[in-house]
Amino acid sequence: LLKFASFKEFMQTPKYTSSPIIVKDKRPQHETSLEYENPLDCSIPFGNSYISIEVKNSDEYNFSAKLMADAFSSKVILRYDSAGASHRNNFDDIPLPDQQVTTPHIHKYDEKGRLIAVKTDEILIDQEAASGIKIGFPIFCKEGNIYGDLTTISPKIQVGEQPTIPFEHIGIDPCEGVSFQ
């Protein structure tokens, strides 16, 4: 609770990361998952902060994104879950029918300092689309004030490497013997 004022200030401050984000590294604990982790630049720091993204089974509709900072022991400041089990906000002041929150949802701290799952208005507009990384990740970035390369838009994101056309160098000049007049 002592850090809550600093936390609120940090959450309202723009945070920047490199763009585009390419989620391509194999996760050591889960070989079928891809991950990305990168530090954030922030004018008002809250410990060392970074962004972490995991895409399971290379499925853009099964991802989680986290805003992390070591100023909290749990490190998780904000988390977006696009798929998986419902989350239960097991608190007496939340009515039982409202305690279960299906995916997609965002975990964020409320005014009482509890990390709870919520569906934002943007998620509720189209929950199926918000489950995908192309729509869900910008929603996460908006909640966390995360931008790409000193811009005011969320960073571009892609899963896996873009395919490349192989280049094979040949030892002959295709223009050899052609007269250019």
Where are these predicted regions, by residue range?
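Generic structural hydrophobic/aromatic packing signal, biased to beta-strands
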Residues: 53, 79-82, 140
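A generic structural signal for short beta-strands and their flanking turns/coil linkers
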Residues: 59-63
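Extended, acidic-biased charged interface segments
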Residues: 108-152
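Generic low-complexity segments that are intrinsically disordered, proline-rich and/or Lys/Arg-biased
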Residues: 15, 21, 29, 40, ...
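Charge-rich, low-complexity N-terminal segments
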Residues: 1-57
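Acidic, proline/glycine-rich low-complexity IDRs
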Residues: 133-181
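An exposed acidic His-Trp-rich patch
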Residues: 64-127
